[in-house]
């Protein structure tokens, strides 16, 4: 397969996009580094609070006019944005690979999912409709309408720099709101590319703004009285203890989609070959840096004696290790590569510390990600190979805490009840999957497991754009989720009108 050309050369000097203008920042500038090559590809400003405030002011100024814009007119802008994204599909995908490190196939998938968010949001004339009832009393009618609220803030994560802000922004804009997006300062280029296309699509000045920055911009967003709601995707400590708490204190609407420790449950009737193939993507896709990544593979011996469970467990683990060992590692623009680097050195050190902790706590290291081969001559700084532990118990650190890297824990349970208890012993509730041919086991699993996204013979339980991206327990803080009808409700207020004519 070919090694693809990079979509741009040199070092990009990024700016903020506020009120339809590209604006320089007075803040310091930080390097954006390609984690595969360790070359600086851009410099991003760490904007000031005043610069964020200016973006909110611009959005507030245009909001009344944008709100009054007919839904079909708003939709035409979004439909044009979708068309432009399709035209620039490959460029947008390669940018993600350069700035994040994921493989080009993963980037193309992310681009497609992001475009689908815009596509679904173009259905807003129907999605935003209210409802009515005549003659609730003699000569009196009642109906509900949905109205936008104002300006929303969106805080993007590093792991999906293109897609995640699009879980929210198209729905907010389609319903008549304005947005200020703060991309991750680690990989902000994708959001700059999106807003360039939004400008070309005819979205009015001030409706869709991008302000780069760090904690100071987040803090300004959480405290600003002009921000009606905040959408956050990131770690549980930040989401729960900072964003959720401070939005509550200031009366903002909030979506906090947070961390995870997802289980994949393998029942005795599962097709091992197909299950393992699905797990390669769900455990090691995006180098394990996603909230829907599976982390613990739980082999279940429902109806088996101890010896049979041990034999089944061995068959599954051996197949998993063998498949993991064949994953090719390198620069994601090489189409033969199946796994790229972690985002930066700090994340590598974090993952390595968990690998060592697993060894220290007595788990068996079947595949050591500290020892790996690259398919080409690259700096090894940000790479870690697939790592597989077996004989992992629920109390071990690697089984309990979110590693956010390519580390798989092999575990076993004697029954489906025991497996569900093990899942519930973890504080997270983002996703869980079961592999089985039994409808009875699958229904029991999906009915009882306290996770927001359930996969049945699906490794990555990723909802489509017209369904909400759910989450429970320490994986989600808020009331409504992003995507689909719940996003429409989040970005609008319900107004009830009761009328009588004399």
What are these regions (language model features)?
Residues 229, 237-393, 417, 456, ...:
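ALDH superfamily catalytic-core signature
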